[in-house]
């Protein structure tokens, strides 16, 4: 009886220690330690990074401003991180550049196109966005904090 009790106690203690160890170590850290990517990083890399996107729909309050972005191709490039990097907007061989940034669960996207001086139409794009839907080829975005009815849909080519 005591041996059976000790085996059961050891099994419970061992399981508890494993659960505690995993709770202190995130999936991202485990992926980094093993040299791999988290599932979110892989999904974002496969479906968003280094891909061409166009604006399918843009609405600023009640105005449809989609036509302002006709002909532009947008690329969020992967640099050294899965969470930030360079971004470009190109139309007729004219390229505007800047940066993009996201948080660790990819719920936020910060767009900052700055060079050379940006056209007024990009002021709408340069903000903190939240993903309302990531269903490639369509990315649906709304302002991160502001509850105004601004909407941006980008489609992967």
What kind of feature is each model-predicted range?
Residues 1-27:
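Sec-dependent bacterial lipoprotein signal peptides
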Residues 27-95, 105-157:
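Lipid interaction determinants
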Residues 100:
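Acyl-CoA/ACP chain-elongation machinery
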């Amino acid at each position: 009886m005591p041996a059976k009790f000790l085996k059961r106690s050891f099994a419970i203690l061992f399981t508890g220690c494993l659960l505690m160890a995993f709770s202190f170590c995130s999936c991202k850290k485990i992926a980094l330690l093993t040299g791999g990517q988290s599932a979110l990083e892989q999904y974002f890399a496969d479906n968003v990074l280094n891909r061409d996107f166009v604006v399918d729909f843009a609405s600023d309050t009640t105005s449809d401003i989609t036509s302002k972005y006709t002909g532009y191709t947008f690329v969020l490039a992967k640099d050294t991180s899965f969470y930030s990097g360079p971004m470009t907007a190109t139309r007729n061989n004219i390229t505007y550049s800047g940066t993009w940034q996201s948080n660790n669960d990819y719920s936020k996207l910060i767009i900052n196109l700055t060079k050379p001086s940006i056209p007024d139409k990009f002021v709408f794009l340069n903000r903190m966005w939240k993903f309302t839907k990531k269903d490639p080829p369509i990315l649906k975005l709304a302002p991160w904090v502001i509850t105004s009815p601004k909407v941006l849909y980008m489609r992967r080519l």
